Each structure stands twice: as C-alpha cells, then as structure tokens.
Amino acid sequence: MIALARRSGWAVGYADEVWWSRVAQPKMHSWSEAGEPLRLQELRVSKEDRDPKALSCYGLLEPDSKTIRLRFVDGRPVSHVTTAFLEWLCQQLQSQGQGVLVLIWDNASWHVSKEVRQWLQQHNQSVLAAEREGQPAVRLIPCWLPTKSPWLNRIEPHWVHGKRAIVEPARLLTAQELEKRVCDYFGCPVVDHLAPKVS
C-alpha cells in the first residue's frame, strides 16, 4: 500500500496519540562529572496548580517529508475528537495540494469505533462527490496495524525522543510551557486545542 501510495503521489502518514506528562520524568542516560551523577527531580503538583498533570496530543508523521503535525486535546482522545483531528489533517493536506492520505495507525478503541468508521465512510463519499464537481478534497485510506504491535508505527520513536528532549530536570513546567517545548521540538506551530463535545 505504501509503495502504491508513493507511486501515485499520495501522502502517507503514521498517526498516534501521546500523553506529555508534567510530572513523570522519562528514562534517559547522561554523562556527568566523576562521582557527581546527574539526577532528575521527582516532581509534584501543588493543590493550587490548576493545570492538568499531562496533556494529550494527536500526531501525524509524514515520513517522506519528515514532517510531524501535532494537535493537542482538552481532555483525552475519544472518537469525536479523533474525527475532528482527521478533518483538520484533511484541511492541512488539501492546502498543500494532496488528494489522498494513506493513514497508518493502531487499533485504539477511538480509531476503530463505530463513530469513526461512519465518519470515514461519509467523509470519503463527500470527497468523491466533490471530485465529480471538480472540487479539491482529501480522501482517507485507513490502514490499521496489527494489535499489540505499537513498534510498527513509525511515529512512536519520535515520541520517546521528544520526551527526552523537552525534559526539565529541576522544576515543574506549566501546561503552556510544556506545549510550547513540544511544538518547538517538532517544529510545529501552537494551534488551538481540539475540544470534546459538551452534551
């Protein structure tokens, strides 16, 4: 599928979600002076701190261009937030002249839910209707990875390296500082968060 996508000029993207913690420190190695090991502080959130302990983020890696697109979420990833992320991705790719995105992602419940599958079907039907009228649009071809195989998703190592790169060893970052560091590391603009629907 990836070879076909490349021959056809389609975009290929590996999508996933990740939590960026303000408290948990990543496992990492470092060099230090003899007898003076570098230690990461155990961080705690005070009761007055209103920021969340962790921020959820959707991401898409486009391996051919080495581009990562990020979109943070208010709350956690759920089906309707996933469809909002996919809609945003389509707008981004359409502005670059892309017509098809081969979307490679795992079998998370919010990827394979009835709501997301119906949205994908309706979206692709509306794309075909738009193409018949000469309107540009981006079709999505989802490819689900086998269960229990996150290492097949090429965006996963980027999350690990990103967490190590943005670490703050001695103090607790605010949610805004954390988001800015993540976006700076990946070279992405800070954009509005995807918000869950309020019933």
Can you describe what each PLM-predicted range is?
Residues 23-26, 112-117, 155:
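A short acidic (Asp/Glu
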Residues 97-112, 145, 153:
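Acidic/histidine-rich, metal-coordinating catalytic segments
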Residues 37-48, 123-157, 170-171:
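RNase H-like polynucleotidyl transferase catalytic core
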Residues 81-102:
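Short, basic/hydrophobic alpha-helical segments
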Residues 8-10, 138-141, 148-199:
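C-terminal anion-handling pockets and recognition modules
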Residues 17-21, 62-66, 108-111, 148-151, ...:
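Short, solvent-exposed loop/turn segments at secondary-structure junctions
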Residues 1-87:
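Extended, low-complexity cationic-aromatic segments
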